[in-house]
């Protein structure tokens, strides 16, 4: 990655941070596909070629965008509580909120990622949350990876629902209403007793998406806690 400011040439009229902020604004509004060097030059009022004095190209910009968003995963003044469950729960909730604000980062979260300042800070902090539990380092990495995989998977489903709403104009309840005629035939057939129970008994608990996220996360943390080494092991 190129230095923050060019060593030679005219005085810069913008910074790498401004370029990154402009790219994030565009991606938040229109998606990652809208990012191009020409578009970013227009956004910040600069010539397209001048951008190459700060970044090597679009891939470089995307790396800067990701690192800037990852910075929001952790509050700048974060102090760990010493309660690994509470700390991981808070981290998972914050990561979910950040990804929902920047949906374009979701498909990039599970890919190979370049080392960068905020990624390193986030990883180090997450590992400190589970340090001292009697786990090997590989087990610590697996715990952190499992929690992040849960968050990413849950958020992907939320984003898919948001896209379905945008595409159809129907929210989930309106869409479900359209399924009623077929589901009535399912009930009448008597062939699917568990589906009948779902239709008659379900739908009351964990309707709120935030509640469902918290429920699944807590069950995941329960499973991790159950596998922790016990004193004297």
Task: Please state what every model-predicted region is.
Residues 66, 96-121, 125, 156, ...:
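Amphipathic alpha-helical segments used for helix-helix packing
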Residues 75-121, 137-140, 144-147:
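Hydrophobic alpha-helical connector segments
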Residues 1-14, 81, 190-200, 232-233:
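N-terminal intrinsically disordered/low-complexity leader segments
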Residues 46-55:
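Short hydrophobic/aromatic patch on the recognition helix
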Residues 18-25, 30, 60-76, 86-94, ...:
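Alpha-helical structural segments
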Residues 122-144, 148-178, 202, 224-227:
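Hydrophobic alpha-helical bundle segments that form small-molecule/ligand-binding pockets
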Residues 1-39, 43, 56-63:
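Basic, helix-initiating cap at the start of DNA-binding domains
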Residues 170-233:
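A structured, mid-to-C-terminal "fold-capping" secondary-structure block
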